Protein backbone atom coordinates (compact mmCIF):
# COMPACT_ATOMS: atom_id res chain seq x y z
CA UNK A 1 0.00 0.00 0.00
CA UNK A 2 1.20 3.48 -0.82
CA UNK A 3 -0.13 7.04 -1.00
CA UNK A 4 -1.62 6.39 -4.44
CA UNK A 5 -3.67 3.51 -3.04
CA UNK A 6 -4.87 5.89 -0.31
CA UNK A 7 -5.93 8.42 -2.98
CA UNK A 8 -7.71 5.72 -4.94
CA UNK A 9 -9.61 4.51 -1.88
CA UNK A 10 -10.63 8.09 -1.10
CA UNK A 11 -11.95 8.63 -4.63
CA UNK A 12 -13.76 5.28 -4.53
CA UNK A 13 -15.37 6.29 -1.27
CA UNK A 14 -16.44 9.67 -2.69
CA UNK A 15 -17.64 8.19 -5.99
CA UNK A 16 -18.88 4.70 -5.13
CA UNK A 17 -20.79 4.38 -8.41
CA UNK A 18 -17.65 4.86 -10.54
CA UNK A 19 -14.94 2.36 -11.42
CA UNK A 20 -11.68 4.01 -10.34
CA UNK A 21 -9.40 1.10 -11.29
CA UNK A 22 -7.68 3.16 -14.01
CA UNK A 23 -6.73 5.88 -11.54
CA UNK A 24 -3.78 4.28 -9.68
CA UNK A 25 -1.78 3.22 -12.77
CA UNK A 26 -2.14 6.65 -14.36
CA UNK A 27 -1.08 8.46 -11.21
CA UNK A 28 1.88 6.09 -10.83
CA UNK A 29 2.91 6.69 -14.44
CA UNK A 30 2.66 10.46 -13.98
CA UNK A 31 4.76 10.28 -10.81
CA UNK A 32 7.24 7.96 -12.49
CA UNK A 33 7.58 10.41 -15.40
CA UNK A 34 8.47 13.21 -12.99
CA UNK A 35 10.98 11.03 -11.17
CA UNK A 36 12.57 9.88 -14.43
CA UNK A 37 13.02 13.51 -15.46
CA UNK A 38 14.72 14.19 -12.11
CA UNK A 39 16.90 11.09 -12.53
CA UNK A 40 17.98 12.23 -16.01
CA UNK A 41 18.81 15.71 -14.75
CA UNK A 42 20.86 14.26 -11.88
CA UNK A 43 22.85 12.05 -14.25
CA UNK A 44 23.69 14.86 -16.69
CA UNK A 45 24.21 17.64 -14.11
CA UNK A 46 27.91 16.85 -13.48
CA UNK A 47 28.49 17.31 -17.22
CA UNK A 48 26.99 20.82 -17.17
CA UNK A 49 24.39 20.02 -19.82
CA UNK A 50 20.62 19.62 -19.64
CA UNK A 51 18.88 16.32 -20.29
CA UNK A 52 17.17 17.92 -23.29
CA UNK A 53 20.48 19.03 -24.77
CA UNK A 54 21.91 15.58 -24.14
CA UNK A 55 18.94 14.15 -26.07
CA UNK A 56 20.16 15.96 -29.18
CA UNK A 57 23.70 14.60 -28.78
CA UNK A 58 22.30 11.09 -28.24
CA UNK A 59 20.04 11.32 -31.32
CA UNK A 60 23.02 12.31 -33.45
CA UNK A 61 25.10 9.45 -32.01
CA UNK A 62 22.32 6.93 -32.66
CA UNK A 63 22.19 8.08 -36.29
CA UNK A 64 25.55 6.35 -36.81
CA UNK A 65 28.55 7.67 -38.67
CA UNK A 66 28.95 10.47 -39.64
CA UNK A 67 26.65 11.31 -36.66
CA UNK A 68 24.66 13.87 -38.65
CA UNK A 69 20.97 14.63 -39.17
CA UNK A 70 18.86 17.37 -40.67
CA UNK A 71 17.49 19.75 -38.01
CA UNK A 72 13.96 18.74 -39.05
CA UNK A 73 14.77 15.08 -38.37
CA UNK A 74 16.01 16.04 -34.92
CA UNK A 75 12.94 17.97 -33.86
CA UNK A 76 10.60 15.26 -35.16
CA UNK A 77 12.57 12.46 -33.45
CA UNK A 78 12.77 14.37 -30.19
CA UNK A 79 9.18 15.68 -30.26
CA UNK A 80 10.24 19.32 -30.09
CA UNK A 81 9.16 22.46 -31.89
CA UNK A 82 11.37 23.72 -34.70
CA UNK A 83 11.95 26.96 -32.76
CA UNK A 84 12.96 25.09 -29.63
CA UNK A 85 15.30 22.89 -31.63
CA UNK A 86 16.89 25.92 -33.30
CA UNK A 87 17.59 27.42 -29.87
CA UNK A 88 19.06 24.15 -28.57
CA UNK A 89 21.25 23.68 -31.64
CA UNK A 90 22.56 27.23 -31.39
CA UNK A 91 23.54 26.65 -27.76
CA UNK A 92 25.21 23.31 -28.53
CA UNK A 93 27.03 24.88 -31.47
CA UNK A 94 28.31 27.70 -29.24
CA UNK A 95 29.57 25.06 -26.80
CA UNK A 96 31.45 23.33 -29.61
CA UNK A 97 29.43 20.12 -29.30
CA UNK A 98 27.71 20.21 -32.71
CA UNK A 99 28.36 21.93 -36.01
CA UNK A 100 26.18 22.78 -38.97
CA UNK A 101 27.18 22.23 -42.56
CA UNK A 102 25.42 22.38 -45.92
CA UNK A 103 23.48 19.23 -46.79
CA UNK A 104 25.23 17.75 -49.84
CA UNK A 105 21.94 16.13 -50.92
CA UNK A 106 19.84 19.29 -50.52
CA UNK A 107 21.38 22.61 -51.44
CA UNK A 108 18.77 24.47 -49.40
CA UNK A 109 19.20 22.44 -46.25
CA UNK A 110 21.80 21.84 -43.61
CA UNK A 111 23.06 18.99 -41.49
CA UNK A 112 23.89 19.03 -37.81
CA UNK A 113 26.70 16.75 -36.74
CA UNK A 114 28.58 15.92 -33.57
CA UNK A 115 32.00 17.47 -33.18
CA UNK A 116 34.74 15.31 -31.66
CA UNK A 117 34.04 17.06 -28.33
CA UNK A 118 30.31 16.36 -28.68
CA UNK A 119 30.95 12.71 -29.49
CA UNK A 120 33.25 12.31 -26.49
CA UNK A 121 30.76 14.00 -24.15
CA UNK A 122 27.85 11.93 -25.48
CA UNK A 123 29.81 8.72 -24.96
CA UNK A 124 30.74 9.72 -21.41
CA UNK A 125 27.17 10.66 -20.48
CA UNK A 126 25.76 7.51 -22.08
CA UNK A 127 28.03 5.37 -19.93
CA UNK A 128 26.96 7.34 -16.85
CA UNK A 129 23.30 6.76 -17.78
CA UNK A 130 23.87 3.04 -18.20
CA UNK A 131 25.60 2.69 -14.83
CA UNK A 132 23.01 4.82 -13.03
CA UNK A 133 20.12 2.96 -14.69
CA UNK A 134 21.57 -0.43 -13.84
CA UNK A 135 22.07 0.63 -10.25
CA UNK A 136 18.58 2.10 -9.98
CA UNK A 137 16.87 -0.97 -11.42
CA UNK A 138 19.12 -3.57 -9.75
CA UNK A 139 16.37 -4.65 -7.29
CA UNK A 140 14.33 -5.98 -10.24
CA UNK A 141 15.06 -9.41 -11.68
CA UNK A 142 15.74 -9.68 -15.40
CA UNK A 143 12.39 -11.42 -15.94
CA UNK A 144 10.53 -8.78 -13.92
CA UNK A 145 12.24 -5.98 -15.80
CA UNK A 146 11.32 -7.62 -19.10
CA UNK A 147 7.68 -8.08 -18.04
CA UNK A 148 7.45 -4.48 -16.82
CA UNK A 149 8.97 -3.27 -20.08
CA UNK A 150 6.36 -5.18 -22.07
CA UNK A 151 3.52 -3.73 -19.97
CA UNK A 152 4.92 -0.22 -20.43
CA UNK A 153 5.24 -0.84 -24.19
CA UNK A 154 1.53 -1.73 -24.33
CA UNK A 155 0.53 1.33 -22.31
CA UNK A 156 2.69 3.60 -24.43
CA UNK A 157 1.14 2.21 -27.62
CA UNK A 158 -2.34 2.96 -26.26
CA UNK A 159 -1.39 6.52 -25.31
CA UNK A 160 0.43 7.20 -28.57
CA UNK A 161 -2.43 5.87 -30.67
CA UNK A 162 -4.97 7.91 -28.76
CA UNK A 163 -3.07 11.12 -28.03
CA UNK A 164 -0.23 11.59 -30.50
CA UNK A 165 -0.43 14.51 -32.87
Q: Where in the sequence are the language-model features?
A:
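C-terminal regulatory/oligomerization modules of transcriptional regulators
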Residues: 1-17, 143-165
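N-terminal helix-turn-helix DNA-binding core of bacterial DNA-binding proteins
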Residues: 20, 34, 38-81
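Pre-recognition alpha-helix immediately N-terminal to the DNA-recognition helix
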Residues: 28, 55-59, 120
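Generic non-transmembrane alpha-helical segments
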Residues: 39, 43-46, 128-140, 154, ...
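Charged, amphipathic alpha-helical coiled-coil/dimerization segments
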Residues: 90-150
Amino acid sequence: MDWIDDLSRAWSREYPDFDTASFPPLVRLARLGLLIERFQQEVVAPFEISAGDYGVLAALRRAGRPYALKPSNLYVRLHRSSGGMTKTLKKLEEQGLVERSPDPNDGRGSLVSLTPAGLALQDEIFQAFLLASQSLLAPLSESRLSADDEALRELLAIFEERLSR
